[in-house]
Regions:
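Alpha/beta-hydrolase-fold enzymes
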Residues: 14, 19-106
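Short alpha-helix in the alpha/beta-hydrolase fold that links the catalytic acid
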Residues: 134, 148-158
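Active-site nucleophile elbow and catalytic-triad environment of alpha/beta-hydrolase enzymes
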Residues: 109-128
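Alpha/beta-hydrolase fold nucleophile elbow
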Residues: 2-13
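Catalytic active-site module of serine/aspartate enzymes centered on a nucleophile-bearing elbow/loop
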Residues: 170, 174-204
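Short beta-strand/loop motif that positions the catalytic acidic residue
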Residues: 132, 138-140, 144
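Core-facing hydrophobic residues within beta-strands of well-ordered domains
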Residues: 4, 29-30, 168
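Conserved alpha/beta-hydrolase "nucleophile elbow" surrounding the catalytic nucleophile
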Residues: 11-16, 141
């Protein structure tokens, strides 16, 4: 914990799921947490029963489970026009420059095993809502294509039922935003950043 008077967590996507699970298992480790597009569920264009069947089958075959999940693959620079992460052309190009300068930062698509573990982590988050009363701000992207916004809504509903609602009682929706809220256009990004700073200040 260290000598600091106050401790805060700011986490995004899978980092949000991991941070939430951490606080459910180890109480009172921070004074407040702000989450942007936490991965409590994954957008997959197939029925849940089919996804589970495929993932459970893949889990039993090591070569398959460690391979890229369907529809994904090695890292490649996608044209800005088809990206589903940000509307900011400038920030998107900056990220591509980072990857060009440091190829080791490039991360390809998820493996079958990673997808399965991600889904299980989201389920654990929802099951453990009653174990954490840390003040929580959950920020949601309106035009989300990566994580399942329905799970954000469910998480906030469960927290409210457990007696420690999310800030505002529901997710703070950033209108028009894609998944990478803090890499978005300034107009959207500033709404999220201001909300985070104000939230942390209230718990200072």
């Amino acid at each position: 914990p260290g000598p600091w008077r106050k401790r805060y967590i700011l986490a995004h996507s899978m980092g949000g799921a991991i941070s939430t699970l951490f606080l459910q298992r180890y109480e009172h480790q921070c004074d407040a947490i702000a989450l942007t597009a936490p991965m409590y569920g994954i957008v997959i264009r197939f029925p849940d029963w089919m996804v589970r069947h495929i993932l459970d089958w893949a889990e039993g075959h090591q070569r398959i489970r460690e391979g890229y999940a369907i529809g994904t693959g090695r890292w490649r620079a996608l044209p800005f026009a088809i990206n589903v992460l940000t509307h900011s052309r400038q920030r998107y190009r900056r990220n591509l420059r980072f990857y060009a300068d440091e190829p080791r930062l490039r991360v390809g698509g998820p493996t079958w095993h990673w997808v399965r573990e991600g889904i299980l982590a989201g389920e654990q988050v929802l099951a453990g809502v009653g174990d954490d009363d840390t003040p929580t701000l959950l920020i949601q992207a309106e035009e989300e294509r990566v994580v399942d916004n329905r799970m954000h809504d469910r998480y906030c509903e469960l927290r409210a039922a457990a007696g420690h609602p999310c800030e505002g009682g529901k997710p703070l929706v950033i209108n028009g935003a894609y998944h990478e809220i803090l890499f978005e256009k300034d107009a959207m990004r500033s709404v999220a950043l201001n909300a985070i700073v104000e939230f942390f200040n209230r718990h200072n």
